[in-house]
Regions:
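A short LG(V/I)-centered, amphipathic sequence patch enriched
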Residues: 40-59, 78
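Short alpha-helical "packing" element that flanks the helix-turn-helix/winged-helix DNA-binding module
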Residues: 8-12, 66
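Short helix-boundary/capping micro-motifs
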Residues: 12-26
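Alpha-helical linker/hinge and terminal dimerization helices associated
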Residues: 42-43, 66-88
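The N-cap/first-turn positions of alpha helices
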Residues: 2-5, 29, 63
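Residues in the recognition helix of alpha-helical DNA-binding motifs
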Residues: 35
């Protein structure tokens, strides 16, 4: 799992839309979808409900459970970067 995948997941949950998240992250929608699919394959479960006619992105039960983990992962990543930048 990569920082870019976690970032994509959190941005989709924040915006409620794959297209809005892609625009905010300056990537194409297909590229964003690939990040999410790679993450779901690694985790072994879907994070989002997929289907035609859905106006807003819906999280699966597992997706809801994963939000807190993703936020902690992102915070730890940021702490690690800051510590490395401040190291002598």
């Amino acid at each position: 799992m990569t920082f870019l995948e976690i970032e994509a997941f959190l941005k989709i949950t924040e915006t409620g839309s794959f297209s809005a998240a892609a625009e905010a992250l300056y990537v194409t929608q297909p590229a964003l979808g690939r990040r999410i699919r790679a993450m779901e394959e690694e985790l072994g479960y879907p994070l989002f409900v997929r289907g035609k006619g859905l106006r807003k992105v819906e999280l699966t039960r597992q997706g809801h459970a994963f939000i807190g983990i993703a936020h902690r992962w992102q915070a730890l990543w940021n702490e690690t970067r800051e510590a490395a930048l401040l190291a002598p």
